[in-house]
C-alpha cells in the first residue's frame, strides 16, 4: 500500500498559528480526512524542514551546537522524506502566510521550496491553507502544481475535487479521527490550536483582515465538540492547548459567560493533567464591555499562568482608524487593558501573571503619515504611565491578503513606513517594549518550569510553552536542548530578557 503524506510548510494567520510546536487545525483536519478516505493507508506527517534536510544531503545550515532554524522542526520521518514524497499516492500540502511572520526557530516554506518538494511527488497533490487564496487569485503562477485546492477544510468526500467553502462543524466532528498516530510522528511537545468559531462577530470589518473574506458568516462550534476534540488530543498525549484560530475568544457564542465557563471547565475536567491552557486573540471592543471583565476573570481562574489576550488597536491615529474601519479607539483599548489587568495581573505559582493583554500595531495602512508614529508612541506612553501591564507587543507591516478591502485598493502610493518602519519599530522597542518587560519580568524574578529550546550566537534561549510565552536568554551558553530548570532574570534589552540558571537542571 502506498503511503499518503501531509507536507506541513507551516501557516500564519491573524486568527491562528501553525508553526511547530503549534499543532494547527489544518494538519489535524488533513490527518482525519486522509485516515477516513484511505483507512488502510500509512499516513505520514512530514515538514518542510524534513525536505530541506534531505535536499541538503543530511547536513544542517549552521555549525553545531547552534540550532538550525531551517531544519529545527524535523520529524521522525526526516531521513525518508523525499522517498515518502516519491512513493505517496496523495500529498496534502499545508502552507500560507496571511500575515508577515518571523520565528527564531522556524522558517515557513516558500513557494520555491514547495515547488521543489512537489517535483519529487508522483501522486496526486492537494493544497490546504492560506496559500490557497493566492493560488486561486493568480492561477497561472500555480499552474500544474496542484491537482485541487482546498481553501478552508478538507474532507474524505471532497479530497479529490477541491473545496472553496468550509465543511460544517457537524461533518468535521463526524470525520475526526484519533490523533495518536499523528502526535507520535512529532519529536517535540505540541501545543494544539483549538478553533472555537469561524468569521468575525463585528458589524464592521477591518480592511486588512482576511477572516471576513475567508468566512463571511459566523459559525460557532458547540462547547461539547471543542471539549471532545481536546479530550481526543489529550488521549493522544497532548498536554498543551491554546484556544485560538478565531478572531476573539471573548466573543465565543456572542460573549456567553455560561458557555465560556462550560468550555474552560469541560477542558479542565476532561484533561486533568494538562500543562498549558491559554487563549489567543481578543477584540478590545468585547474586552472593554462589562461582560469582558467577567470573562477575563473566568480565563484567569481556569487557564494556566503566563496567558496572553492579544488585542489589535492597530493604530492610535484617528485618521488611520477611520480610513480602515478599525472601530477600536485608544479610549476603548485603555478600558480593555484595564479589565485584563484587573482580572489577571496577579502572579501564579510559577511567578508569571495569570493573564495579561498583548497589543498589535500595524504600519502601512492607508491614511498613514509621520504623525501616525507619533500618535502610536503617545498612546503606548499613556498605558505605560498608567502603571498597566502588557505581556507582549507585535509591530508589523500590513499585507494585502487576496479578497480583503486592502487588496482591492491595488498599488498604493508608498507610505512613510515603507522607508521608516525599522526605525519606528526600534523606537517602540526602546521606549515601550523594554520598559514594559522590566515591569512585568523584573530583575531578580525567578521563573521555574523553563526548557532550553534554541542555541544561537548570543546564547541559549529558554521558554515555557504557551501563547507568546516568556523567553529568557542565557548568554554565552550552549545548553543541550530540552534541558529543564529555573532561571532568574538578570537584565533586559529591546525584545529580550536575560537570565541565569539558579537551580539544578535535568
Task: Label every model-predicted segment.
Residues 40-57:
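A short beta-strand-loop structural module common to alpha/beta enzyme folds
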Residues 254-258, 381-451:
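Radical SAM enzyme [4Fe-4S]-AdoMet core and its adjacent flexible, acidic
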Amino acid at each position: 500500500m502506498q503511503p499518503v503524506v501531509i507536507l506541513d510548510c507551516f501557516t500564519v494567520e491573524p486568527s491562528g498559528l501553525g508553526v511547530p510546536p503549534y499543532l494547527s487545525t489544518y494538519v489535524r483536519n488533513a490527518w482525519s480526512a486522509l485516515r477516513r478516505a484511505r483507512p488502510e493507508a500509512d499516513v505520514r506527517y512530514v515538514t518542510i524542514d524534513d525536505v530541506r534536510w534531505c535536499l541538503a544531503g543530511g547536513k544542517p545550515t549552521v555549525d553545531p551546537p547552534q540550532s538550525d532554524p531551517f531544519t529545527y522542526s524535523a520529524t521522525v520521518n526526516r531521513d525518508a522524506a523525499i522517498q515518502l514524497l516519491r512513493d505517496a499516492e496523495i500529498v496534502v500540502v499545508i502552507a500560507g502566510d496571511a500575515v508577515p511572520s518571523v520565528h527564531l526557530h522556524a522558517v515557513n516554506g516558500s513557494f520555491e521550496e514547495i515547488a521543489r518538494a512537489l517535483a519529487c511527488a508522483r501522486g496526486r497533490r492537494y493544497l490546504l491553507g492560506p496559500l490557497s487564496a493566492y493560488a486561486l487569485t493568480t492561477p497561472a503562477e500555480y499552474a500544474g502544481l496542484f491537482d485541487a485546492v482546498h481553501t478552508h477544510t478538507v474532507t474524505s468526500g471532497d479530497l479529490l475535487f477541491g473545496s472553496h467553502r468550509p465543511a460544517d462543524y457537524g461533518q468535521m466532528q463526524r470525520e475526526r479521527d484519533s490523533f495518536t498516530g499523528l502526535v507520535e510522528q512529532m519529536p517535540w511537545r505540541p501545543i494544539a490550536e483549538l478553533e472555537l468559531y469561524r468569521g468575525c462577530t463585528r458589524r464592521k470589518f477591518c480592511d486588512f483582515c482576511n477572516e471576513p473574506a475567508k468566512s463571511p458568516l459566523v459559525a460557532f462550534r458547540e462547547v461539547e465538540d471543542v471539549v471532545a476534540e481536546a479530550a481526543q488530543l489529550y488521549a493522544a498525549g497532548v498536554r498543551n492547548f491554546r484556544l485560538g484560530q478565531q478572531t476573539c475568544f471573548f466573543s465565543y457564542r456572542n460573549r456567553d459567560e455560561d458557555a465560556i465557563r462550560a468550555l474552560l471547565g469541560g477542558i479542565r475536567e476532561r484533561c486533568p493533567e494538562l500543562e498549558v491552557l491559554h487563549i489567543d486573540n481578543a477584540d478590545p471592543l468585547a474586552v472593554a464591555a462589562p461582560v469582558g471583565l467577567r470573562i477575563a476573570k473566568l480565563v484567569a481562574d481556569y487557564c494556566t499562568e503566563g496567558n496572553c489576550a492579544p488585542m489589535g488597536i492597530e493604530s492610535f491615529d484617528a485618521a488611520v482608524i477611520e480610513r480602515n474601519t478599525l472601530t477600536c479607539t485608544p479610549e476603548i483599548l485603555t478600558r480593555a487593558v484595564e479589565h485584563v489587568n484587573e482580572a489577571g495581573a496577579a502572579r501564579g505559582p510559577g511567578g508569571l501573571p495569570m493573564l495579561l493583554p498583548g497589543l498589535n500595531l500595524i504600519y502601512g495602512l492607508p491614511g498613514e503619515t509621520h504623525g501616525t508614529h507619533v500618535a502610536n508612541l503617545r498612546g503606548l506612553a499613556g498605558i505605560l504611565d498608567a502603571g498597566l501591564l502588557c505581556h507582549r507587543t507585535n509591530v508589523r507591516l500590513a499585507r494585502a491578503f487576496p479578497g480583503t478591502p486592502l487588496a482591492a485598493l491595488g498599488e498604493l502610493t508608498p507610505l512613510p513606513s515603507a522607508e521608516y518602519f525599522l526605525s519606528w519599530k526600534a523606537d517602540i522597542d526602546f521606549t515601550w517594549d523594554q520598559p514594559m518587560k522590566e515591569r512585568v519580568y523584573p530583575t531578580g524574578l525567578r521563573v521555574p518550569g523553563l526548557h532550553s529550546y534554541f542555541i544561537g550566537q548570543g546564547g541559549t534561549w529558554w521558554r515555557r510553552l504557551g501563547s507568546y510565552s516568556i523567553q529568557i536568554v542565557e548568554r554565552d551558553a550552549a545548553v543541550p536542548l530540552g534541558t529543564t530548570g529555573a532561571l532568574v532574570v538578570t537584565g533586559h534589552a529591546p525584545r529580550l530578557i536575560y537570565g541565569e540558571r539558579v537551580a539544578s537542571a535535568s
